[in-house]
Amino acid sequence: MSDFSMETLKNLRQQTGVGLTKCKEALEHAKGNLEDAVVYLRKLGLASAGKKEHRETKEGVIAARVDERGAALVEVNVETDFVANNNVFRAFVTSLLSDLLDHELSDVDALALVMSSQEPSLSVEELKAVTMQTVGENIRISRAFYTPVNSGQSVGIYSHGNGKAVAIAFLSGSENQEALAKDIAMHIVASQPQFLSKESVPQEVLEREREVFSSQVAGKPQEVVEKITQGKFRAFFQEACLLEQAFIKDPEVTIQGLIDRAAKASGEPLKVEHFVFWKMGA
């Protein structure tokens, strides 16, 4: 039976910022004494990291990986750009991608509880505390993403600005179109579409845009209003929808046109299934 209460455990976690497992271990070692437990964690090099937990984190990196396990994306923030490029910090971020893929996770809280692939004796949360101790800054795992990659898919990743913006594009119909998928991912980072296609734009967004367009042409004849509104919607779709956008490397063709051209050349039924785009802090 434990020699400490849940309240003591909660206090130790709040005071040190150290993970649940190590806090339990510390309290068991200290026979429930909070101060002795803090000393125990300090000897392990963990407790002082907790003091950094409330520092603001505006810098960081977005990292992505695709392999046979699936596709993973994680954003991890720190206080300065200097630490964002630190090898110790980058190794921690890389290990998170392995953890997401190993455990098929998209939840930051769930990720914090799994045992780290980088240091199997520590949970991800505990390794984060150790890494904070090493680099001397607060670290925040802001968001995580995982999705399986199916057979017959090609996946492309593009990272811009040393991990400040990252896109992943998923194509169906072929496993041999990675170069095309990467080109589309690069385009996504440059053009930042909000939606995949016209059909995927939510109804409430369409209604909002229609209200805006209507207010801009109020007082004009109905047939003029309809014509102008159609033109404005066309421009909206060309700006907001990936498949309607002009390809950044060849503005004479849309992304849908690019896909159609590649499908005709390869004889494969290519299609952009979905994409993920993350920008630092967005």
UniProtKB/Swiss-Prot annotation:
Q: Which domain of life is it from?
A: Bacteria
Pfam families (alphabetical): EF_TS
Q: Would you tell me the Gene Ontology cellular component terms?
A: cytoplasm
What's any GO biological process attached to this entry?
A: translational elongation
Primary localisation category: cytoplasm
Enumerate the InterPro entries for this protein.
EF-Ts_dimer_sf (IPR036402), Transl_elong_EFTs/EF1B (IPR001816), Transl_elong_EFTs/EF1B_dimer (IPR014039), Transl_elong_Ts_CS (IPR018101), UBA-like_sf (IPR009060)
Q: Localized where?
A: Cytoplasm
Q: Where is this region: Involved in Mg(2+) ion dislocation from EF-Tu?
A: 80-83
- GO: which molecular function terms? translation elongation factor activity
Task: List the PROSITE patterns hit by this protein, alphabetically.
Answer: EF_TS_1, EF_TS_2
**Keyword set, alphabetical order:** Cytoplasm, Elongation factor, Protein biosynthesis
Please give the HAMAP family that the UniProt record associates with this protein: EF_Ts
Functional summary from the UniProt entry = Associates with the EF-Tu.GDP complex and induces the exchange of GDP to GTP. It remains bound to the aminoacyl-tRNA.EF-Tu.GTP complex up to the GTP hydrolysis stage on the ribosome.
**Per the similarity annotation, which family is this?**
Belongs to the EF-Ts family.
Name of the featured protein: Elongation factor Ts
Organism expressing this protein natively: Chlamydia trachomatis serovar D (strain ATCC VR-885 / DSM 19411 / UW-3/Cx)
The primary gene name is tsf
